[in-house]
Amino acid sequence: AFGTENTCRHNLKYWGLEEYLGFGPSAHSYMTGADGRGLRFNNVSSVEKYLKSWEDTLEDEGPSAVEAFSENTLMDDVSEYIFTGLRKNSGIDLGDFRRRFGKDLWEFYSGHVREEFEEYVDGGFAAVTDDNIRLTVKGMNISNRIMALFV
């Protein structure tokens, strides 16, 4: 039997848009800003530059180890939530989606996206209930194609 002890917990953090901090050269982090939008940043890749930045920071001079910083838009967060949620066997909890984003999923994606997704449902690649959207085992084999609808 497959148990929860076989679950990759750090991936679940990424796929749930939960905060995480990365330490060390090339490490990436994700935090939630005051406005609720996602903030991403990563450290320099050079070990020497990373260590030097910490030495300088401790001496109160010089730049930080952060090399790049980006702030998500609302649609970035929505798209990432859907894209990563569909990677999980449990799929997307539509109640959590509404709480997080203040609207139903299909208010963000109507028209051709919804129509194309319904074709995947009709073909047995995805399943939809009142509470959940998920990919079936058959759908996992073409998951990137399905997830691309929401990016």
Residue ranges of each PLM-predicted region?
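A short, conserved structural fragment
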Residues: 118-131
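Short secondary-structure transition/capping segments
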Residues: 7-11, 119, 141
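Short, well-ordered alpha-helical segments
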Residues: 108-116
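An alpha-helix initiation/capping motif
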Residues: 76, 111, 137-140
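Short, amphipathic alpha-helical interaction segments positioned at domain boundaries
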Residues: 138-151
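C-terminal scaffold of the Radical SAM
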Residues: 1-106
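Minor-groove-contacting beta-hairpin "wing" of winged helix-turn-helix DNA-binding domains
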Residues: 132-136
